[in-house]
Amino acid sequence: MKEIEKLKEEYPLLNKLIETEEVLWVNPNMEKYETAIKDSPLSEENVKDAKERLKRFASYIAKVFPETKETKGIIESPLLKIPSMKQALEKNYEQPILGELLLKCDSHLPISGSIKARGGIYEVLKHAEQLALQHGMLTEEDDYSILDSDTCREFFAKYSIAVGSTGNLGLSIGIMSAKLGFNVTVHMSADAKQWKKDLLRSKGVNVIEYEADYSKAVEEGRRQADADPSCYFVDDENSHDLFLGYAVAASRLQKQLEELEIIVDEEHPLFVYLPCGVGGGPGGVAFGLKLLYKDNVHCFFAEPTHSPCMLIGLMTGLHDKIAVQDIGIDNVTDADGLAVGRPSGFVGKTMEPFLSGDYTVSDEELYRLLKELADTENIYLEPSALAGMIGPVRVCKEDAYLQKQQLMEKVQKGTHIVWGTGGSMVPEDVMNGYYKTGEALTILEK
């Protein structure tokens, strides 16, 4: 790896990142959609295939998870206008947010209460389908609800699934795998919250805890799975299936925007702010949105100041060859879902030509935003899910991106969507603790 001093000279923004300051990075490598898609390893066909698979499984999902009955087994979340929060942001940051502000509540996705219910559940279902088809338990024409049987559960019990996680991915993989009948092991890093471990164990999931961070948990999970031919490892750092499961969100969002009569075109740009850990969730969603809205959607990743792995990987072009620890950042943050020191090389390289930018936000800011959203809209998210909330303020305030893309006039007719990635499953006492922290920090700031 290039000497750190050389990197600092080449990329002056690194100095601020090393000081854990909040920064906004505009991606100089973003290309026009038509150019970017030509070199992409994934296509619209891949996303369509994932969408169809989720449809095939809908009857099974509706049967085993009654909370999805209303949506006929489609796992989807609300898209809400948050005008009171918008006013509060404008007042607190003394910055008008140009355009409308909405919250995509993946925090309230059924089954596992986070964005990971998209990719994680999809990858487990795809694996289950492949096994069932190979062994004649199922044909693609069948009603997939037949998988809810003792025979099928006994069949899946011969196989195991493993994953490394800081929390939410473990929840979605664990809950789904256990429901189908798989033996499932979740390798959890030191920053994983206790309640997430407890919940998984209550569902019959084997949880292995590590003193080290996320990358170590993934590495160990991968190593153990490699030694067992009947074990399938969900590889959060490299998985195309996870990525495609997330990408399906875009066409669902398109339908919701149409229902709200919100136009997205050249004169009405869409800005989307996505909390980013290793990169799969935000990368997949952003990729799906680019397929639909091309150059009229502008996607930004949001990371904690203590774990800006994707920003560093993208900015230096080193991707997964550099970790935040290499430049002296500790990767310690209360935003547990984003506490990742080394980004996914696959996601970084795939998203590099599509991504508008990436910014960092401090833990203190996340807690203040958590309290503000609860006070103004009565919506409770976990700290990491608030990383997107400051995005519209940043992009409007530091308007380098808007200037560069000639959006200064258009942004007022545009729409900002903050992706709320998790929170509905947080136990009440834990959420109260988060709120109190936000309250204390708000008083301190004033």
From Swiss-Prot:
N6-(pyridoxal phosphate)lysine found at: K116
Pfam families to which the protein is assigned, alphabetical: PALP (PF00291)
Signal peptide: none
InterPro entries in UniProt: D_Ser_am_lyase, Ser/Thr_Dehydratase, Ser/Thr_deHydtase_PyrdxlP-BS, TrpB-like_PALP, TrpB-like_PALP_sf
Swiss-Prot/TrEMBL catalytic activity: D-serine = pyruvate + NH4(+)
PROSITE patterns: DEHYDRATASE_SER_THR
One MF annotation (Gene Ontology) recorded for this entry: hydro-lyase activity
GO BP term (any one): D-serine catabolic process
EC number(s) on file: 4.3.1.18
Alphabetically ordered keywords of this record: Lyase, Pyridoxal phosphate
Family of the protein in this entry: Belongs to the serine/threonine dehydratase family. DsdA subfamily.
This protein's name: Probable D-serine dehydratase
Organism lineage string: Bacteria, Bacillati, Bacillota, Bacilli, Bacillales
